[in-house]
Amino acid sequence: IKRLIEQVSFEARTNEFVDKKSGVSARLTIAAYEAAVSSAERRAIIHGQSNTQVWISDLSGIIPAITGKIELVYEGEQEGPYEVALNLLNKSIRSIFVTYFPNPDDVKKRKAPKKSANAPEQKQPENPYAAIAKWFDAGNHLDLFLDMKDEDKIIELYKVDGLFGIVKKHFPQAGEKQSALLMEFVLHGLSSYSIISKKMIDGKIEFNDMMGSMINLGDMGMDDDAFNDYA
């Protein structure tokens, strides 16, 4: 979580919508971290829990901290502070994700080995995210409410085929809650690489397959912006 928040500051310093002359406030990282912790504490109070952990979904609470600590150029103002902040957060997730898990772009670029009449059949390159993508492609979707209990969130995350498997493969020593946090991170990471879709609406983050998400938006006559889609 700390690395993601720190990365937001780095992304802001190179973003085309952020005013380079005014710079990025040194307090952005501190303010954002405090906001994320506050979101987690609020959820614990709602459910009468004595402790909880900061989830990736709690980072939705750092948006005001980001918008309050950066100055935008004219194009950024036209885009909207909220959208710029979401974009920075998404780029942060995208950048950090590949330091923990295989790069989805590399997976997309893999080509099947060429067949030869005399050579034995070669095994297809493994796609570590195939099971996850297939689960969503089958019409499944996952709703993670911002205020849901830790236990309920963990149950929901384990419903996604292949999600625990990839975390266990790369972090075999992770405990239950740490694994669940990494599982949530995988979903956000895959959405940042357009493997699955993600949108926030009505106090929840909904993960879906890319095609189904586009069809639903088309049926309702609305575009991504109407849902603050930041996948």
Where are these regions (language model features)?
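C-terminal engagement/docking regions of AAA+ P-loop ATPases
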Residues: K21, E41-A231
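Conserved AAA+ ATPase small/helical "lid" subdomain
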Residues: I1-V54
